[in-house]
Amino acid sequence: RTHDILAPFPEEFNRKMISVVTTYHFSPTEQSKKNLLAECVNDKNIIVTGNTVIDSLMLVARQAQTTPFSSDILRQLPFLKKSNVTQRIVLVTGHRRENFGDGFEEICQALHCLAIMHPDINIVYPVHLNPNVREPVNRLLSGVRNIYLIEPLDYLPFVKLMVESYIILTDSGGIQEEAPSLGKPVVVMRDTTERPESVASGTVILAGANKENIVRSIDHLLTDKSAYNKMARANNPYGDGNASVLIRKYIEERFR
């Protein structure tokens, strides 16, 4: 819960609406359980299991280990061919409607600034198809030597790219849960998050869609190895990949 029906919209609205018509709630965290209790959901109908997205991530991450990048991706990201070269990738995803307009202008300015400050990094941005995203991104970032604007990726190659990345900069909710399981620090380009457990556990930094905050946060992680390791080694509060097993076990016992 963000407790703001408009941020993010429509996700926060959908979560609250679905909870009203749900009988059994398989909650990803203890904090999520507390949120449901505060909305008068019966304690007996809430089961803390972790999030099934981590189960899927772990499955796909194992597949990604033995699946090479396609020739098309290697063409777009030629530095991936240099497997013997130490490289740091900053992976970017951004699509939130809350950031349309001034927000994406600030985000793109921040990325441009970081690319100049750190010419040794590679910034990879699979650009969302929405024209409200593509226009400012292409206008402000096309042609920058170490910024790679590519088409959206399927899930398996995206997970493989997450594994290869050093830091992830995103406005996505799901990536806030997934990336910490891969040991990747996450900087979130939003002012609020429905995943406060990530912030509390130290796996996520909230920077907002603000140029100065984004630059400062990413630069700090790129230059301070201790700060980087602290985030990379923090425990993911969203589970260990066994949520589906726990859910199945509950359903089998409940409806036996």
Where in the sequence are the language-model features?
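Nucleotide-activated sugar donor-binding and catalytic core shared by glycosyltransferases
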Residues: R1-Y125, N130-R256
